[in-house]
Each structure stands twice: as C-alpha cells, then as structure tokens.
Amino acid sequence: MSKLLLPIFAVAGTLAAQQVVAPTPETGGSARGDGWGDYNITQSFETGYRFHLVGGDTGEYRSDANYGNGLRLLGGSFAIHSKDGHGKWFDEITLNTSGLGNDPYQSAILHVEKNGLYRYDMSWRLSDYFNPGLAVAGGEHLADTSRRIQDHDLTLLPRSHMRFHLGYSRNTEDGPALSTAQEFNLSGSAYPIFTNVRRQWNEYRMGAEAHFAGFQFTVERRWDFFKDDTPATSDGIVAAGTSSDLTVLQQFNRSQPVHGSSPGWLGNLHTRRKRWGLNARLTYVSGRNDFALDESALGVDQFGSPANRQIVVGGDASRPDLAGDLSLSYFPTDRLTFVNNTSISNNRIDGDSTYSEFLTGSNLGTTIYFRYLGIRTITNSTDVNYRLADWIGFYGGYHYSDRRVETVEGFTLPAFANSTENDVYQVGNQLQSGLAGVRLRPWKAFTVNFDGEIGRTNNPLTTISDKNFQTLGGRAQYRARKVQLSASYRESYDFQPAFSLFSSHSRGYNANASWAPRDWFSLDASYNRQHLDSSSFLAFFAGATRSTLQAKYRSIYVSNVHAANLGVRFAIRRRADLYLGYSITKDTGDGRATVAPAGTTDPIQALLDSVQTFPLTYQSPLARLSIRISPKVRWNAGYQYYGYGETFGLLSYYQNFHAHTGYTSVLWSF
C-alpha cells in the first residue's frame, strides 16, 4: 500500500517547489545594526497589505489557499549579537517571523544562546483550517478550526561532554464544526449537529547526552498527554422534511471526552570509527487511554410517535509499545561498505468497553466488549556498497521481515447467563526482498543510477498488502557551476494472488533544470508525471427495492498526474528584482470525456464510474517585483492567481474556483 502513496507524495513535493508570492525573499542590504552596550542589534521588517478577489466556490478556496484582505507583518527578523562573544546573560538572540497578524499561516522561530552555558530554541506555528465538506453528507459536514503548534528545547552545557536537555511541546486544535447524527434507529435520517472542537496534546521531555571514548549516549524521558473534549449539540428543531418520514429532532446533546497518556523512555548509543560504526536505539511507551460517551436525543420518530434515545459508552485501553533498532556498519576498505540493521517492535492494545442504550423507555441492555490486538515485527536487512573504480560502483541488499498479528474479540451480555463469547485470530507473514543497483560517474559533473527491487510475501495480511512486487528505477544528474539538470524514472508493480483480484501499477517520471548564466538572471523548471492504476473486486449490498449481494463489480481507479513548475528571476541594474513563476497540476484521469462511459445503463455501474477517476486542473501563475529605494528600504508588490477546475465533480458537485490575490509591502532593514 505504501507504494501506492509514493506518487501522491512525489507530486506534493513538486507543488511545494513553487515559490509563494509573499513575503519577498529579497533583503534590504547588509545592515550594520545599532550598538547597545556590548551588543549589536539588527532588524528587518516587511509590512504590507494583502488583497484577494474570489469567484466560484469560496469554500474550496479557503480550504486550499485561504488568504484574505488586510494589513500584515509579512516577515520579520531581529538579532542581537555579542560584540566579543562574551555577553553577560546571552551572546545571541535571533527571532524570525512570518505572516503574523491576519495570515492563515503564521510562524515564529526564536533562538537564545550563551556560549558554553545554554541554548534555547522555540518554534511556534498557527494554521487556520477550513473544510467545507460540501461534496459529502449533503454539505452538512464542515470544519473551521485553528491549530497551534509550539516546541521548546533547552540545552544546558551544549558544548561539553555532558549535556542536559529539557523540552516541552504543545499542539491544540479548536473551532466550530458541523456533523450529522442518525436518529432514532438505523433506518432513520441524519440531522445536523454542531460541535465545538477542543483537542489538546502536551509533551514534556528531560534527558542527558554524554560523549566518552568516541561514543555518544543519549537517554530521554517523555510524558505525553492527549485529551479531546469536543461536545455536540443540535440547533433548534429539525425535521426530516419528507412525507414518508415524520421524524423530528427536538433536542440533542453528546459529550464524548477522550483522555490519554503515554509516558516513555528513549535510549540511543552511537559511534563512528574508521573501520566500523554502531547505532543502537531502544524506545518504550506505556500508553493508556480512557473514553466515555453520553448521548441523548429527544423528538418524534418516523411514525409520528414521541421518541427519546440515550446511549452511554465507556471504556479504557492500555497501549504498551516496545521498539529496538541495531545498526552495524563495517568499512573494510575505502571502497567497500557493509551495513546490517535489525529491528524489533512489539505493539499491543487491549481494553474493555461497555455499551448501554435506552430507546423510548425501553432498556435495550448493556453489552461488555473486550478487544486485544498484538503485533510483533522483526526485520533484518543487509546492504553492500562497493565502488569498483572512481567512475563505477555497485550496491545490493537483502531485506527480511517477519510479522505476527494476534486478535482477541469478546463480548458479554450481563443480562443473559453463559453469553460470553471470545474469538481468537492469529495470522503471520514473511516478506523477503532483494535489491541491486549500479552507480556510474563517467565524468565529474555527471552521475547515473540504476536500481531495482523484487519482493515476495508468503501471506499478505490484507487484499491490498504487498504480495509479489517489483520496482525499477533510474536517475541521471548533471551538475556544473551555472547549470544543473536531473531526470528520474520509477516503475512499480504489485501482483496479488488470484483469489484477491487486486493489482496495482505505478510509474513516475521527473525532470528538473536550473540555469544561472549571469548574476542577474536565473531559471528553474521542473516536470513530474505520475501514473497510477489499481483494480480490485467489490462485494456489497444494494438494490432498488431491497438490498441484495452485488458481486459482479470491480473498483478500477486511474490517475495520470502532470505537474510542472517554472520560475524566472531577473535583477535589473541592481535596483530591482523581478520574479515570474507558473505552476500547473493536471490529472487527466483515464481520458474519458464524460462521467460514465457511453452506453452505461446500470445505475450502480454509473455510480462507480463517477468516482473511479477524478480529472482536474490546478494552476497558479505569479509575479513579484521588489525595488530598492535605499540601501535599507525596499518596496515590494506581487500578484498570484489560483485556478481550480474539476472535469466531473464529486457526486456531480463542482468545487471550481478562481482567485486573484496580491500584496504590496515595504521592507525596512537597519
């Protein structure tokens, strides 16, 4: 399955290569700063105004870009340095910020250091997330939340042989969201409910690092705490709105807190010698999780009679996790390297839960559930790298993994004697793979790599797990002072046994070019092509009058993604800098022009066809101009266009939009 995700991540990496229009990467010159006692202070601030104009689906725009109007501190930097490196309380303070004020994506990085005594690093990020959810649940699922992430790390005696570490991290998410609840039975309608998202994660760290006799030993103690206290309520009285369903939801409340903790240990031993190296790591986490749910609903059922429903759920679980890695490296000669790595992991989850339900005065009883999941994995890999000559080298390896999964499922009905039932399932598999490659360097600036891998699994755990797979790939790169060129290709096949009827195939092409013939001109371009197709057997219940088993359909998903980036930079008489860029991502799908192929009369097949390919186009040209007013002041202006279009739309709902965004700012350095 991981091989299927590789093309998606590769395309995401290509899109990330495009520059954003603001803040400007240009600087205001080399500021000398101002003296303050034994310190020198330098500052740089870019303040400006953003604007945007959106047409089409504004919800999709907010989900993808989300830039609005208003004043911004687009970027800022502040630094204090000791003149002689021996300040009283600190020797260095640096602060860098981006998007503070009203941008949906904001960040700040702070560094404080006193040479040889302490080092403090802090990072803070804020991201406003909006998900309109209009393509599912009739538009009744959406989220408008903010996530704040911060990390703090303090190192005492950072340059000594014995160092001490303290750390703290925090991740919070809050904001309104909309969901649905089904009432008052399994055949009832779904009604909108409002939630107030409140999620929080905290981690505390302390540890030490020792250097002795060429070894580095690290030990760290961690405490992780997570809680989700998101309530849900209805907003007034909501009716089903159909003549055949008289259900009315008059009142709804749900409380579902989840609290967990994960204290753990981390130990690491590392050394690198002339002929050998060692890296050993051991981690243990003792996790525990407690949850409860109290839900009540009041109204009228589908037949017009008064109805009320109350559900109470509670439980707890333990999650111990042990993992160890040992990597040994051997360098008998300068041209030969052996690396062997052994990893062991043991994950377990077990706990009890209870479910009780009362429906319109009737006690439907209590059910007690027990679940246990244990996964033990052992992996070993040996890799050899041999450089036969300066221009040619070979590498190969053998990888082996053994996994065992055990599941216990049990339940009890306290109201009935001898109702306890336990089912135990055990399954395991072994994966063996071999890889080989050659590295060529016919001349100093040019390198070529070819590699391939073949893998076999005796017992895939799921229908989409790797069975018999093979990959082939190559990469060529040319690097000179003024030009850099690279191209790569990778192909992956995964064949399953005949009874699973699943297969997948992916191909990836990539090319990059960078050219800087003059100091005042540079060009960067990239192209990425990813093809993915997967085929699987489907079995489900559906029918116009009554549901029956449908076993004649297949899921065939086809994606053909083309992504390209182009950026050109001009420096005009050392007075101005102009950047022009263009980015496009286009998925052509399987090439069809309509949602369902011509002649499709089966309504189920037509529905499946509509979601088995998703052709779309996303493009974003931009232009940015930065003019130097004085050695310390620059005026900046930029424009960026976003265009998103779906050929079919998901379930006939189109989320197309186009947006014009831009900014103007002043950068001041001193």
What is each stretch, according to the model?
Residues Q18-G37, I41, R50-F670:
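Gram-negative and organellar
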Residues I8-A17:
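Hydrophobic h-region of N-terminal signal peptides that target proteins for export
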Residues M1-S2, A17-Q18:
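Initiator methionine at the very start of the polypeptide chain
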